[in-house]
């Protein structure tokens, strides 16, 4: 992801806590500058970046409000935060405790909006990410959810079967539908698989 962003951005700085990941990025992706550190206290100056991109990470963090406050600190006025996270309503229906053992807290759209606004962001758009027709077919092949099939293997520390590996490798961007949460929308954001928020630092 960071390397794709580097193809259109003047400078990309990635941050990761894991030393092996930092070394991997340094050796494999020369266009990406990578820092070892805590996402809740990034070693960059105040108001030093134009965009913070954070996809599928916040659900793994223990102090989500602090992380979002840190994103606000890093952004210049008018800068944007792009954030995605699994939708708690579809990932862990009927419970506040995540099914995925690697998640600390999952959010629904209202909770994500509240976290962003409480930190001082203005939410520009809240979107739901839905499976398109090809992914719906893959879900059916894997017992109703290709995501649940992956989680089950991870929890069991079991290898992925060849058909699951092949299907995951075959997923393309165009297999997803991103639908804004606006009045009259064809989709209910509470039915989405993931949430995609774009928020602005005033």
Question: What residue spans do the PLM features occupy?
Answer:
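Conserved SAM-binding loop
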Residues: 1-94, 108-113, 197-199
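Hydrophobic anchor at the start of a short beta-strand
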Residues: 12, 123-124
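Charged, low-complexity surface patches
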Residues: 14, 105, 188
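Phosphate/oxyanion-binding loops and surfaces in catalytic or ligand/nucleic-acid-binding neighborhoods
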Residues: 88, 118-123, 132-133
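A short secondary-structure junction signal
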Residues: 95-96, 137
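Short glycine-enriched, charge-decorated loop/helix-capping segments at active-site entrances
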Residues: 97-102
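Short alpha-helix
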Residues: 104-120, 126
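A C-terminal cap/extension of S-adenosyl-L-methionine-dependent methyltransferases
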Residues: 125-202
